[in-house]
């Protein structure tokens, strides 16, 4: 089964809220079997308008990533995130190997 990936671009408006979001989100990422593949504000942009903190999470499947995203635990963290960040977020299915 192909892996699932959550890719987010977060434009931080309130660093303290972003810190609280990060602390709240990590346990739910782990609880739903996710792992952080990449995260950081220092992405080299070569095309488009991406700016901010880019994060990529890996899950066992696209369905597992969606289960994480819609979980009560993550939605509570997201409520914190929404107070201090603008976000673009997508969940995609990996390639079957």
Map each language-model feature to its residues.
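C-terminal structural segments of small proteins and small subunits
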Residues: 62, 66-90
């Amino acid at each position: 089964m192909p892996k699932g990936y959550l890719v987010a671009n977060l434009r931080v408006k309130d660093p303290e809220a972003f810190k609280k979001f990060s602390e709240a989100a990590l346990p739910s990422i782990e609880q739903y079997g996710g792992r952080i593949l990449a995260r950081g504000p220092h992405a080299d942009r070569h095309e488009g308008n991406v700016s901010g903190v880019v994060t990529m999470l890996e899950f066992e499947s696209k369905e597992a990533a969606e289960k994480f995203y819609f979980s009560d635990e993550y939605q509570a963290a997201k409520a914190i995130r929404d107070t201090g960040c603008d976000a673009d977020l997508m969940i995609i299915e990996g390639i079957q190997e």
